[in-house]
Amino acid sequence: MGESTVTSLEGREQAVPASVAAAQRPGPLQRLRTPRRPRLWFEILLIAVSYWTYSLIRNAVPEQRAEALRNADWIWRMEHHLGIAVEESVNHGVNAVTWLIVGMNYYYATLHFVLTLAVLVWLYRAHPGRYGAARLALFATTAVALVGYYLYPLAPPRLMNGNDFIDTVVVHQTWGSMASGDLKNMSNQYAAMPSMHIGWSLWCGLTIFTLAKLPWVRILGLLYPTATLIVIVATANHFWLDAVGGMICLAFGYAVTRTWSGALPHALPKQPRPGP
């Protein structure tokens, strides 16, 4: 039987049977689950391909217009029955302040991309040991959202029939949103449930809150998903219940991460353990 050596606490080398040494080495699955330093080129390629795949699948889901409008009418009636149908009032109130609604239109069109990428870059540079687990939570959240788009097509409030919601992008002729205006034919108009604006912004907010050191930065982390909720309602792109769907997807994403990594991202070491 072959032998290998280990170094004792006193610095002396001792022979260890090869079978024992082999048993102490992590297996392939354990090595995959162990946090490691991410490779920049691989992460750029992975994120680009993953987002392209997500967009392709999301927009390939059949636009079931009639069912999406029925589902929107049902949610709107249910909210009225429960006394929580505030979306139209918020939409009209914010639309009356031109500079505010124009800013919200651009916020809706851009920030969920920009800030999500910014948080990923920050994790990559400052928390490489937690990066992989946090990225897995984001990817799992986004993947399960695709199931929602397929199983529950939902029209946004601005596309409902017989209601007075204002399509703020059309009215104020702002650019950037693929949900309405000239770019609407490039995006699935009936993929409102769940809201990934909320799923992604809450992921960003919780990541910042749990990992940032400065108190004011942590507070900004919590304010970001709150502001996003106001924006998606004010622009009539979502019911607020769509935000609940996004939160449920994020909870699923964190559950996947907890199962795979054995801990949530913030509980993992900041720096990856050196591997063999």
PLM features per residue range, with description:
Residues 106-123, 197-205:
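Hydrophobic alpha-helical transmembrane segments
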Residues 2-114:
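N-terminal transmembrane-helix/juxtamembrane module of multi-pass inner/ER membrane proteins
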Residues 205-209, 250-258:
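Hydrophobic transmembrane alpha-helices
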Residues 154-163, 188-193, 227-253:
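Interfacial helix-loop-helix junctions of multi-pass membrane proteins
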Residues 52, 56, 142-150, 223-234:
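Aromatic-anchored segments of alpha-helical transmembrane domains
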Residues 58, 65-77, 86, 124-217, ...:
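Membrane-interface loops
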Residues 34, 38, 42, 46, ...:
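Alpha-helical transmembrane segments of integral membrane proteins
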Residues 43-55, 113, 117, 138, ...:
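Alpha-helical transmembrane spans of integral membrane proteins, capturing the lipid-embedded, hydrophobic core
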